[in-house]
Curated annotation (Swiss-Prot):
The gene is groEL2. It catalyses: ATP + H2O + a folded polypeptide = ADP + phosphate + an unfolded polypeptide. SUPFAM superfamilies: GroEL apical domain-like (SSF52029), GroEL equatorial domain-like (SSF48592), GroEL-intermediate domain like (SSF54849). Gene3D superfamilies: GroEL, GroEL-like equatorial domain, TCP-1-like chaperonin intermediate domain. This is Chaperonin GroEL 2. It is an enzyme of class 5 (isomerase). It comes from Synechocystis sp. (strain ATCC 27184 / PCC 6803 / Kazusa). One of its GO terms (molecular function) is ATP binding. InterPro entries: Chaperonin_Cpn60_CS, Cpn60/GroEL, Cpn60/GroEL/TCP-1, GroEL-like_apical_dom_sf, GROEL-like_equatorial_sf, TCP-1-like_intermed_sf.
Length: 552
């Protein structure tokens, strides 16, 4: 397929046009008074959203050269979302401002390479400044971060704070669509295993169709058990201890299963069994997780352990075990969760997570960390209409991601104030730059950092330039509260941003801007010409009557 090629100013102008087209559609969604964007869908009703990344992903421009610019900004938004979970609109606005000011200077004769180098140096300095001013998240700040990121919805803020309190920062919190009108929080405390009881004859509560054990012992093995003789020693020891027994094995069948069911029915031993979760190497790893959490050992021939020699101190223990048809929940004591073994295991899993390139593996590792650390919470989102439901779900996902980012790297004053304070520190840093063009780059960044606050104010119907000047005159945590329309202490007012979100937005915007400024040629696919329309066939004259063809 043939290509379109453009060079120098022409190529950069095309990129800028595409960047502006996408950024102008995204920027209006910024802040608690951000406007909505209606997205037409090929199938179904249009979607009304107030989420920058969703708008960015939908945009495809007809001009291939301009579309290349739009794709670059999509990359900024996607990368920021991937790293910090929020801040996509802020990153887009900063990138647009950097490109606009940068290209203006390149057109005036500035060296693009020197500008890029200056942008990189200043960005590195500003990232260090963000780390220096960030404060750890404490108490009500978690709810405040979530409230701000959800479009100022206090109910969502309180719900996310409650979920994080219950499952800890290592727990898994997921967002699902509910069939009801209400948004609710469900928390599964303890380790959930996606396997249920092997036989319904183990059920202890026939009304609820589940098995409930208090203070059970847990036998964990990767073996398939079919002969009861292997289990007799451990069953006798558990019977003497007078406690329930939960068996987790690859499978239990035949004579072994029948004997366990009979003993349970006769009241000789309170016992139940489930199959080991997962498959292959992951199964061994999950069994080891269960063993570490419950203080037991995995009985495996791989390490020289056999079932007929198991002692009570090799069995795990839990405060409670609940077995349903399809899943099991083990609640370990607080002392077990706080043990050195669990902490070491979580640390090891974090290293595996960092080293993994597979999204699937990362998801599974994160689930394992959550089950060891605290549990799993599900926020079920409800709304009156499908359109409102999707918008609300996007807001809650943003809020959840922002909250996790805040816990990781701390918080800074929100409302674009931190960016204004950073811009004020650039002047003193300029002395460390090598030449005038790098200092021009510093001025470009300083101006670009004002753009998010300017847009926040504009979306609220206020003159952005006036608000920017007022915030510049203020000090410390004083900034513009869009809700009240006043300059006040934003930390005290709960208007806070995760430091990770601000950092990621700045770094990703600077990266793309540097690339655009140093682009000298643009090579894109030439669009295929539209296929000619079919000619009008008219009424196919001359076919009427068809004389002489009469039927006898």
């Amino acid at each position: 397929m043939s290509k379109l090629i453009s060079f120098k100013d022409e190529s950069r102008r095309s990129l800028e046009a595409g960047i502006n087209a996408l950024a102008d559609a995204v920027r209006i969604t910024l802040g608690p008074k951000g406007r909505n964007v209606l997205l037409e869908k090929q199938y179904g009703a249009p979607q009304i959203v107030n989420d920058g990344i969703t708008v960015a992903k939908e945009i495809e421009l007809s001009n291939p050269e301009e579309n290349a610019g739009a794709k670059l900004i999509q990359e900024v938004a996607s990368k920021t979302k991937e790293i910090a979970g929020d801040g996509t609109t802020t990153a887009t606005i900063i990138a647009q401002a950097l490109v606009r000011e940068g290209l203006r200077n390149v057109a005036a004769g500035a060296n693009p390479v020197a500008l890029r180098r200056g942008i990189e140096k200043v960005t590195t300095f500003l990232v260090q400044e963000i780390e220096a001013v960030a404060k750890p998240v404490e108490g009500s700040a978690i709810a405040q971060v979530a409230t701000v990121s959800s479009g100022n919805d206090p109910e969502v803020g309180a719900m996310i704070a409650d979920a994080m309190d219950k499952v800890t920062k290592d727990g898994v919190i997921t967002v699902e669509e509910s069939k009801s009108l209400n948004t609710e929080l469900e928390v599964v405390e303890g380790m959930q295993i996606d396997r249920g009881y092997i036989s319904p004859y183990f059920i202890t509560d026939s009304d609820r169709q589940l098995v409930e054990f208090d203070n059970p012992l847990i036998l964990i093995t990767d073996k398939k058990i079919s002969a009861i003789a292997e289990l007799v020693p451990v069953l006798e020891a558990v019977a003497r201890a007078g406690r329930p027994l939960l068996i987790i094995a690859e499978d239990i069948e035949g004579e072994a299963l029948a004997t366990l069911v009979v003993n349970k029915a006769r009241g000789v031993l309170n016992v139940a069994a489930i199959k080991a979760p997962a498959f292959g190497d992951r199964r061994k790893a999950v069994l080891q997780d269960i063993a570490i959490l419950t203080g037991g050992s995995v009985i495996s021939e791989d390490i020289g352990l056999s079932l007929d020699t198991v002692s009570l101190d090799q069995l795990g223990q839990a405060v409670k075990a609940t077995l349903e048809k399809d899943n099991t929940i083990l609640v370990a004591g607080a002392d077990k969760r706080a043990s050195a073994g669990v902490k070491e295991r979580i640390e090891q899993l974090r290293k595996e997570y960092a080293a993994s390139d597979s999204d699937y593996d990362k998801e599974k590792i994160q689930e394992r960390i959550a089950k060891l650390a605290g549990g799993v919470a599900v926020i079920k989102v409800g709304a009156a209409t499908e359109t409102e439901l999707k918008d609300r779900k996007l807001r809650i996902e943003d809020a959840l991601n922002a909250t996790k980012a805040a816990v990781e790297e701390g918080i800074v004053p929100g409302g674009g104030t931190t960016l204004i304070r950073l811009a004020g520190k650039i002047e003193s840093f300029k002395a460390q730059l090598s030449n005038d063009e790098e200092r021009v780059a510093a001025d470009i960044i300083a101006k670009a950092l004002e753009a998010p606050l300017h847009q926040l104010a504009s979306n609220a119907g206020v003159e952005g330039s006036v608000i920017v000047e007022k915030v510049k005159e203020a000090t410390g945590n004083q900034g513009y509260n869009v809700i009240t329309g006043k300059i006040e202490d934003l930390i005290a007012a709960g208007i806070i941003d995760p430091a990770k979100v601000v950092r990621s937005a700045l770094q990703n915007a600077a990266s793309i801007a540097g690339m655009v400024l140093t682009t000298e040629a643009l090579v894109v696919e030439k669009p295929e010409p539209a296929a000619p329309a079919m000619p009008d066939m008219g009424g196919m004259g001359g076919m009427g009557g068809m004389g002489g063809m009469g039927m006898m």
